[in-house]
Amino acid sequence: MTEATLTPPAVPRLTSLSHGGGCGCKIAPGVLSELLKRATPPALFPDLLVGTETSDDAAVYRLNDEQAIVATTDFFMPIVDDPFDFGRIAATNALSDVYAMGGKPILALALVGMPINVLPHETIAAILRGGESVCAEAGIPVAGGHSIDSVEPIYGLAAIGVVHPSRVKRNAAARAGDVLVLGKPLGVGVLSAALKKNQLDAAGYAQMVATTTKLNRPGAELAALPGVHALTDVTGFGLLGHTLELARGANLTARVHYASLPWLAGVEAFVADGVFTGASGRNWAAYGTDVRLADGLPPVAQALLTDPQTSGGLLVACAPEAVDDVLACFRADGFDRAAVIGEMVDGPSRVDVA
């Protein structure tokens, strides 16, 4: 842990105050889709380059021919018990959506909901400091925010970034023949479930915090590469869910090579022991009909592939000739587990895993 926990022993664990943690507490994708269908369709705005059409990572609004604004918000309940780490993870996760659009963050606003009569002010202050530390690392200020007294602890950011209109990377622009590259290892949801069950050791906790607090800064550089066609980040809907968004947006089939997927240490063993989040099942129920799992995959495959990631890695669809540059971009920023995991091919809008 990077800062001593400030809560006294009598104070409840942060994770005990929430019914779900991190991106695992997202509304299930099927329910969210149904809710959005019932919403009033937005008016047409010619300068709104990216809205809700393809469930992309952030909204993008063109100011002029040289500049567009990237706007997003993300918040959730605690995924860890250390308040400083919770703040860091939530802030890193929120900024990721700006990077996933190819943008550069310029400022953030804090979104804070806390059970004021349950948590000491020192604990809440540590959460805020954690978020501020990540924003400082990203080179941006926390310029304000909003707070409420809530039943469960909630923290996150509204993040604003900038991007050149020609460099906006949507999740619906993959092409047949593109190679899929993933920036971070998978399994955060499994580790969070193990933590909540008191089964995660210090080494497991350290790797969980390390991956969830690593900023997806390569996004802006990746957007500048001519061979990069589509970009998103893997979060609450799991690898399958976000890969399926690429496939649906491009009307293609995404082929994922299970043996090539990078995993955080220990997650396969945890799942084999029945330790994973309820969100995995909800994710599969929402989109499993559009996924084909090959015979011979390990029994843990479905739970791992649907595992909700908090502050997960960037998922890139790029031309084959751009793969080396994409991997070099990741490696230069310390993403040493970045890996080629599949490709986009002609076919129905689905994900095939073999």
UniProtKB/Swiss-Prot annotation:
Cofactors named for this entry: Mg(2+)
EC main group: transferase
Residues at the site labelled Important for catalytic activity: 26
Catalyses which reaction(s): hydrogenselenide + ATP + H2O = selenophosphate + AMP + phosphate + 2 H(+)
GO cellular component: cytoplasm
Binding-site positions, Mg(2+): 57, 97, 233
Catalytic residues, chain numbering: 23
Pfam families: AIRS, AIRS_C
UniProt key word Signal: no
CDD domains per UniProt: SelD
Cofactor note: Binds 1 Mg(2+) ion per monomer.
UniProt: ATP binding residues: 26, 54-56, 74, 97, 145-147
GO molecular function: ATP binding; magnesium ion binding; selenide, water dikinase activity
Database matches in SUPFAM superfamilies: PurM C-terminal domain-like, PurM N-terminal domain-like
A GO BP entry: selenocysteine biosynthetic process
Alphabetical keyword list: ATP-binding, Kinase, Magnesium, Metal-binding, Nucleotide-binding, Selenium, Transferase
Gene3D superfamilies referenced in this protein's UniProt entry, alphabetically: PurM-like C-terminal domain, PurM-like, N-terminal domain
EC id: 2.7.9.3
Family: Belongs to the selenophosphate synthase 1 family. Class I subfamily.
Stated role: Synthesizes selenophosphate from selenide and ATP.
Subunit structure, as described in the record: Homodimer.
Protein name per its UniProtKB record: Selenide, water dikinase
Gene, per the UniProt record: selD
